[in-house]
Structures are given as C-alpha cells and as structure tokens.
Design a protein with these regions (language model features):
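Conserved glycine-rich cofactor-binding loop
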Residues: 10-11
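Conserved glycine-rich Rossmann-like NAD(P)H-binding loop of the short-chain dehydrogenase/reductase
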Residues: 24-41
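Conserved NAD(P)H cofactor-binding loop of Rossmann-fold oxidoreductase domains
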Residues: 94-99
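Substrate-binding pocket helix/loop in short-chain dehydrogenase/reductase
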Residues: 102-103, 110-115
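Active-site helix of classical SDR
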Residues: 126, 162
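Residue(s) in the substrate-gating loop at a strand-loop-helix junction
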Residues: 146
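C-terminal helical subdomain
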Residues: 186, 202-237
C-alpha cells in the first residue's frame, strides 16, 4: 500500500479526500490543528471500512495534530511520520483560511494571517517534504489552491493573492520536480460547499459538494495531472477570463462588482 500525508484534513475538502484515499487503499496520515475533528475523521473512516465489502484493501488512518504556521512543530510531525512509515508516496497541502474582504473592510492582521496560513504554511510544508522526494527521485506533491488565484477578483483581497502566489510557485518548481521524477498537482476548485464558502453572501454558480470535489481530485491525482480544476463548466469560464487583456477583463469585473458588491 502507498502512504499519504494530508495537512488540513480536519474539515472540508481535505476531510473528504482523506476518507477517499483511505478507502481506496492508501495509508493516510491526517494532520490539522483540531485533534477533535481529526478523531471524528478517524472514526468515520473506521466506520466506512467496516461497511465496505473490500475492507481488506482499505488503508489505515493515523492522525497527527499540528499547526502549519509552526515550522518546528510541523518538522517534528514530519519526522515522526517518516520514522513510522519510512517512505511517503503522496503529500497534500489542504490547509486554508478564507474571508471575504475588500478595501472598505480591509483587516490588515487578518490579511496577514490568511497569507501566513495559505502561502507561508505551504512554504513550510514544501521545505520539509521536498528533500525526501528529491532523495528518492519519486513521489507526488499536491496542493489545493483555487480558481480565485487565476486573476484578481472583488472581495478576494488577501485570499486570492495567497492562492495566486501558490499557483505561480507550483508553475516555477514543476520542471525541477519533473526532472527528478516527482509529480506535482495544483488543485483549483470552483465553489465547493464547505464551512469556508458558507460565509459567502453572493451567488456561487455551479456549487458542488465536498464529496463531488474529492471525486474530481482523486481522479486527477491518480492520473497525475498537473492541474486539477473543477467543475469545468465554471473553471473554463475563468480560464477564458485569465487570458483576455485588461481592456476587456477589467470592464467585466467592474460590472460584476457594481451588480453584486456595492451597497
């Protein structure tokens, strides 16, 4: 069986993805700040395994509580995982903070917190796991970004910037990882029904469930796709907006802002 470490597995997409991978034969180490939620995840996986006909082919679940902002704690967790599993085949960074924000409600400390968790946390994660994969010249690194990182969007002041930085970083390191036989996947979901998107007070077209999202991601990971984006009816619209010039893009975004965000 292959071994996987998921950081940010206590809720949302990370939670469902941990379940999906474990049922499909991965030994999963699930990490997050909330030990309580990790125990809920563990219990759900154990229950799912009992009700699965092919339970002998399911993987095991192990939980390790850790905060991605704490580099030394994250390092200790990674060392513990390697001591117990020796080799990790797949790592997934799913930690994130999301808050709607524009200039009228610009919270500097919250903005720094969003950047620190979403992007600096990924840097901490990447710095720790890369030597293991480079040494083995094998493995798979994945991270959950967002279509909000494609281009600047209203109400996404800090969150969009953090995801854009993540996408840019992954594009930059892809050639070096590929040269060392290491797969890299950047996961860009559209709107997924989670506790994060529950805060939104604007229309969310093509909203999908966490379970649907985990299915899309699992299929993409198994195919070792560089970008896993979904639902495509929505993401292709944003991909088009990504490539058009500013003189076309900005009037479109300005119109959306005036319709949905001005009070």
């Amino acid at each position: 069986m292959k071994n996987c470490w998921i950081v940010g597995a206590s809720s949302g997409i990370g939670f469902e993805l941990a379940k999906k991978l474990c049922i499909n034969g991965y030994n999963v180490v699930a990490s997050a700040r909330s030990l309580e939620n990790l125990n809920i995840l563990k219990n759900q996986i154990e229950d799912d395994k009992k009700s699965t006909k092919d339970s002998q082919n399911c993987g095991d679940i192990m939980i390790e509580a850790v905060d991605v902002e704490d580099y030394e704690a994250l390092k200790k967790t990674w060392q513990n995982i390697l001591e117990k599993n020796h080799k990790i085949d797949l790592v997934i960074f799913a930690s994130a903070i999301y808050e709607q924000m524009d200039l009228r409600d610009f919270d500097l400390e919250l903005s720094k917190k969003i950047i620190h968790v979403n992007f600096d946390g990924f840097l901490n994660f990447l710095h720790l796991i890369t030597p293991h994969f480079m040494q083995n010249k094998n493995g798979h690194i994945a991270t959950i970004a967002s279509v909000a990182g494609y281009r600047g969007l209203p109400k996404s002041l800090a969150y969009g910037a953090s995801k854009s930085a993540m996408i840019n970083l992954c594009e930059g390191i892809y050639p070096e990882l590929k040269a060392n036989n290491i797969a890299l996947s950047i996961i860009n979901p559209g709107f997924v029904k989670t506790r994060l998107t529950a805060k939104n007070n604007f229309p969310m077209p093509f909203l999908i469930s966490q379970e649907q999202a985990s299915d899309y991601i699992y299929q993409g990971l198994m195919a070792k796709k560089f970008e896993i984006h979904f639902p495509k009816k929505f993401t292709f619209i944003l991909k088009f907006l990504r490539i058009i010039p500013y003189k076309i893009y900005l009037p479109i975004i300005n119109n959306i802002y005036r319709k949905n965000h001005q009070k």
